[in-house]
Amino acid sequence: LDCNSIIYDSIRELHKSNLLKPAVADNYEPISALLCTKIQQYIDAIRPSNNVYIAFDGVAPFAKMNQQKSRRYRSAFLEHHNVIPKSTFNSALITPGTDFMNYLSKYVTARFSPKFIVSASDIPGEGEHKLFQHIRDNHLPDQNTVIYGLDADLLMLSIFHSDKTNLFVYRE
């Protein structure tokens, strides 16, 4: 499971139901709890018989850092000038090394380890790349592998790994 998109889904869901509190630190537990509920729902829907690998984006490769930085500045600029509605949650907190991501990593690890493998945001690399490294290192020819994530890179990486038989991408 490439889980960064699930973080954003959880924040949007709490925001729509007016459960997202103005104080950022007060949002850590509700977001983390909802995220774990959603992860469990995906696990229940997929019904894995073997391993579950839960990945969050860690520190990105240097080449991608400028892209991420400009995306964050653009969002802040658009919010500041009321082009897009202000959020009660600063999405820049969904960055490796922030208090929020450190809290979330510990929360998810406590909830799902040791039963499942959790590659938290303190482990470098984007979630989808960590997933495929795990597949390359551990894939068995007769094993079905289901990958969840909304990142466009996930589809490209899946195509590049088509030599791995029985590889499926689960998306909504």
Task: Describe these PLM feature segments.
Residues 1-172:
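Noncatalytic, typically N-terminal accessory segments of nucleic acid-processing enzymes
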